[in-house]
């Protein structure tokens, strides 16, 4: 019998009343368990196996699917559960984590990062910025290490910088002519990309960013992921459509 602290990142129906639950845990990394009877509303496993739930879990099992015996909810992130926009961002965070990691490879830092991101989304901090921070933090997990602290070509740390997927990082104005396909980004966007990649989440504080800046950030991050990660995430397309819808609603309310 194993015990762990984990976050439910995916659930699927299994047979008439069971679920297969994918969790990312502090102790074991990503694991899968069968939760028998969890689809029944009166089941003792119903609440603890809801998507995004953070809890303590006890299960039997080895390298394959385990069997969940019991669970205790630590945090169910109720605000996320009740808000369609928050849900979309949290779903993307969990799918990215699922696709970027292998079974049973513990990474306590990644567990804590995911928990902090979900908690901050639930508490009402900007979900788009939090998700962008998470995307930048996940790059090393995917084996991607863009050069963000100096020019990726010449190594200079001063000057004007653009972002280059071809050169795998930022490049200074001295090297612009070496990559005509580079992304010309506003200076504050380059600084934020660097901050998101290098600084710890708890040191960033509450960042107030204009929508135009967030759009630039998203363009740069999406381009880098598309050209380097090899991932296709269904939740990302849905999330981008949601972003457009949310921006339209905000614009209408401001008029």
Swiss-Prot record:
Keywords: DNA damage, DNA recombination, DNA repair. It comes from the Bacteria. The keyword tRNA-binding does not apply. GO terms for biological process: DNA recombination; double-strand break repair. InterPro entries: ARFGAP/RecO (IPR037278), DNA_rep/recomb_RecO_N (IPR022572), NA-bd_OB-fold (IPR012340), RecO (IPR003717), RecO_C (IPR042242). GO terms for cellular component: bacterial nucleoid. It holds the Pfam family RecO_C. Belongs to the RecO family. Involved in DNA repair and RecF pathway recombination. HAMAP family: RecO. This is DNA repair protein RecO. It comes from Listeria welshimeri serovar 6b (strain ATCC 35897 / DSM 20650 / CCUG 15529 / CIP 8149 / NCTC 11857 / SLCC 5334 / V8).
